Amino acid sequence: MASDVTQLLPGIPYRHENQELRVYYADSEFSPAEGRFVFNYTGRAGDLTLLRGRSDAEHLLVVILRNGSGDEDLRPLHAPELRLLHFILAPEVRYSHLDPRSRLEGGGDRSLTFDYGPALYRRVSTDAFELGRVLTLIDCRSLLRVELGRHFVTRLAQYIGEDEMRVVHEALVNDTSVQRWTLGGAAQRGEVPATALTPAAEGGAFVMRDPVSIYLMLPRPDNAMPLGIQASTAASPLVRQYIILTTPGTMSVFPWGSVPKNPSVREAVTHLHSEATSMGQPQLQGQVFQLSLLPFYRVSGAACGVYSVTPSVASGYEDAVHGEIRETHEAHARCLNHSGVPVTCGFLRTFDETSAPLSLNTLVCTSTLATCPVSMLTTSRFMRGQYIVALGDFLPVGGPDAPPYVYRSSSFLCNTIVNTLNMFGKTRARICISGTSRQVGFASTHAHLGSLLPRGGAVLYLSKLPQEALSQIRGRGVSREDLRELVNRFYLRVSSHQVFLVLKDEPVGDQGRQGYQFLQKAAGLNGCAFRVLGRTCDQEGLHFVDDLGEGGGGEVPPRRMGYSPEGAAFSLPFESPVKKTTREYAEGVDVQRGMTLVQEGALEWDMFTPYATVHAVLSHPTVASKEYFVRRVDRFSNGLVRQQQGVGALDLPLADYCLVVDPAVETFTGTSFSREAHEASAPLENISVQEALELADAPERWFDSNGGAAARRPVPGHVLACGEQGYKMINSGVLGGQYGITEVVTNIMLGPAFELAQLQITAAVHWNEGPDYRAQLERAVMACREFCAELGVGLAFSSGCSSAKYGGPSHSPPGPDSLNLISFAGKARVDTSAPRLTPELHGPGHVLIHLSVNREVLVAGSVFEHKMTGLRHPLPPVEAHRVRNMFQCVQALVARGLVTAGHDVSDGGLIACCAEMALAGQCGVTLDIQRGIHPLLVLFSETPGAVLEVPLGNLAGVLEACEPFGCFVNQIGTVEPRTGEGHVVVTQGGSVVFRDSLANVMNSWTSFADEQFSRFGACLKEAEMYRKDYGDNELDAGSLEDACAGGELTLYRSPGRRVGAAVLCLPGCTEPLAALHALVNSGFEVSVVGPEDLASSRDGLGAFAGLVVSGVTGARANYAASRGLVQGLVAERAARETVLVFLNRTGTFSLGLGELGMEFLCAFGVFDGAAAGGGGEGGGEVGRGLTDQSFGNRLIELEANASELPESLWLNFRVPWNTRSVALRHLAGNILPCWAYGTHLGVRYRADGLEYSLDALGMIALHYHGRRAQDWNFARNYPRNPTAVSTVAGLCSRDGRHLGLLCDPSAAYHPWQWQHVPRRVAGLRTSPWAVLFHTLFLDTLKSMS
């Protein structure tokens, strides 16, 4: 008889080794939650009162050490590995000293100590996992687990009881992911073992079955086509019941290894996937699903949209809502960013609780644009006996997480998987793949394995399961029934980002190696976990063989794995999730009526004061500036983004669309690494070493001589836009989708020209699982299909997710206000260099015209109606042919150059649209409302359309051009001169209805972003006055300015002498695409190298003249992870010597960009010459005396941002006149804008006077600079200087060959990559930053003489 499994699975840890626990404390300011708690309860009357000045907090570091492994005593490793750990984590505690004793006073009846952090007795947090992977790469063997928490101490006026403790508990922890720690007993025992499960999975109550996702995306019980496919308009091929809408394109594949070569340019397909998720679901599940569709993809851009409750003081949980919005967006966006994906567009829609209570359930929609070479999509036939492989570490999630998302997706883990597959894709063995399927949505391992196998089943071996699951099973001596339950609990019933593949059993190549062996080799080179789980078989289900010993025969190697289920310890069938979610509801229900929520009433317009109402609408989070979010996430780093959210000189987040260029670099002629011939897409000039000697110091000769006569070369890519109308979905679930699709069209029509039939839209659904949800959902998605068919655009439903949970028969169904939402994202292939419009107004005296799809003024479902009235008016249907006509009309006007700016009319109505255009252009506008209608009705109308800026001389031509399209056009206002303080003015019949300054309009519009910063950014104190001093950067390109403005750089190549540059990619990091493109564009042959290449021989970089380190790690704590990964290179003697030999070899250069690049050069002692005190002109040998313990003697580190937040900013930089930098010598004295992204964007010195020594030696390569292009205008305050400490933003070695920059000039190599080009040089044809890379190429070629 089976034993009682519940007795085997208590709520405490299961297995542990001999361990030792250490606790360390470090000084800290209050966290945002602690600060609010102290502010709210200090000195106030009530049941809980904190004494003033008696609250404090510290960082709390918990380290679990392994004392032994087998017969090996690991205790001698504790001290050196703890020193290394303290070094790596120093930035995370703001370089405070980590001490085993707290400096805070505790004890006494009224003293309260509250320690908290990630649940210690559960799965490691994602931060701890990523740090653990870094420590493993450094070969740290005694550090078992590291968690960073908080130590909060306060003194109360009352005695501490349960009620007081409950208040503190509710303020600081959530019990889902962050829990209170009780370390005393554990510290005495020296044991803090853990299970592999998150708290949600440990409870066992959560089941990963989303009824909406299943009903929308999976086949019906009778194998009928899924609803999502029925509602799609496309006739494209189906991949596992998922419609793939693709557009053609090109993509570069870069070589790996120790020989520089040309990249390969491949024909490719581009796909857009939209993923609907609920708060706390895995942030990268959509990206991992897309990887199963296109296994060798490159994701080049993403959108991230959030739905939530409007923060309100009256609600009583304003702090919680602000926190959820911020934490949720940050978790999704940063997971994408650290996967190498810029977030280029998105939205935020908040619902006032009086209109739609959400129970704090924040919803998210992410869309990712991925490109994959067509030639890599060939697969093998699926058969029995093929190998089933799992890639990636097992990091299970068993239920929804909660802010601050300590169990969020790991970009580090996903990067290792993507890099492994991309390397494998460059081998012939890639055709061995016969299956990569994955279930869409939030699904279990069991469901993913079921989707992987189109027929039959699999024989899996227990010894091949992840170690995290095996540690809970080995040696337990349980029955087969209990073993089955343990495997279910710890592996099959949880979700993870492991990627499963099926590979055929057949030798590849002359050596006869199996395909899985090629994949295993690629995984080892990229630090990716790899396991062959078993083989496919004919019998359905999963059949587990017990090879754990004790009669099982021991672990079985892949070649000996059988594929017959005979002798399996137990088997598990594949269950249909559709049958599990089927519910019957009453027939004959009026579905349409249930989806239309109307509460009509007469609006008393006179009760609304124009001034107050306009400002109220502009400050609503749905309308207001999203700059807090936009400036916290990477939006540029891959170098492919031509238009991101920021518009105009002030970088205001107003773009209606984004532009992403194809990930292909074609400016080379010759044979690629994959041996195909390639002709350059631009004219090249071959030069010799002697010619390089003559050209190297004459940069004015590098530019073409035809001035502005050169024809514009097309730059292919994609335009991407979002659309959603959540308020209108409340009014009508059927018609609301039409307005969301229309918003995609009105946004994207302002971009480069394309045919509307080329537009492809993907839809993601959040739906309330209440009564009749299936019938309502079917009605809504089919209405979307019909509308798209009338428009003539492609539509595919890509995911679904419940927005609210139905509690079953004993619970009341969700109320009628629970959310039903459909989010849309559209893409089209375009020439990104073609004419287009942004909201930035250009000229005084220009007129504004309003185009709309009809003459109705529409306040139904508007922000005004939602926020100000409490009413819901009926929505009129949208006429598809009028939307199509307006699209064609606007595109014609743009193509003919008749209009100069444009912005779609959407959230906030006409007044918000015009105000945003005025802010983007920094010039006033005057609007005139026709008589006979209340002006506020017109101002707040959200009738789909656009406002266009038209030069007065073009007005007649524009009106004439609109006539054939039947568009409704009105001249509504004028653009005012840029003199003095601009105003937004609204008149009617000669009377002023509204008038206010641009400064006041800006204050209202940015109020929500300011509120977010005040809550989550660090206190800037007196420097707060400078926080809005951002943007409007002047430029001074010195003697090269005219050449850059009027000409293009000549593209040089040296066919006689190979000029190679290595680009370093460390495990868990992303390929630095912008740097690779910049190098190839400037003449280099390149190759991506990893630690194995560096360690393979002392001369592992002998074929290269340049070494570039750029990009980000996959870890959330990017700079700390950078320190760890680079230290791994330093600790590996062979790799260290290879790097030092290269750095000291004559004629080489290195370029470190961003936090990772700067850390690399700092760790190898490149900048230590300032303290060398000799060594001649070069300052001596680089890295002299460097050892694996040298990290304690570092002179230079990176400083944290003053905001204590990630920053993504377009800043001004100045190259000092006296810099020794070889790469920057032709830019000396220049003041240029560039992109910077990171959490540590400043230089920190560990020796007094070091900055002065660096300056005197000419080792400072770059300074943060102010707005004005004047030498003295150094930037000393945040945000122009992100750290507000040292102005230094770049350093070089004493000989100038090695350069480290905190900005990324490779992402500003082309003028089209710039956030904004100053009006004075509006026709800029060459970015001065390209001169840096050309200088490196010519100098390197020159040195070969």
From Swiss-Prot:
Q: Which residues cross the membrane?
A: none
Q: Report which superkingdom the organism of origin falls in.
A: Viruses
Would I find Heme among this entry's keywords?
no
Q: Which InterPro entries match?
A: Class_I_gatase-like (IPR029062), Herpes_virus_tegument (IPR010077), PurM-like_C_dom (IPR010918), PurM-like_C_sf (IPR036676), PurM-like_N_sf (IPR036921), Tegument_herpes_virus_N (IPR024346)
The GO biological-process annotations, alphabetized, read as:
intracellular transport of virus; purine nucleotide biosynthetic process
Main localisation: virion
- Localization: Virion tegument
Molecular function via GO? phosphoribosylformylglycinamidine synthase activity
Q: Which residues form a coiled coil?
A: none
Is Kinase among this UniProt entry's keywords?
no
- Keywords, comma-separated and alphabetical: Virion, Virion tegument
Might you report a single GO cellular component term? host cell
Provide the protein name.
Probable membrane antigen 75
Q: Which organism is it from?
A: Equine herpesvirus 2 (strain 86/87)
Encoding gene per record: 75
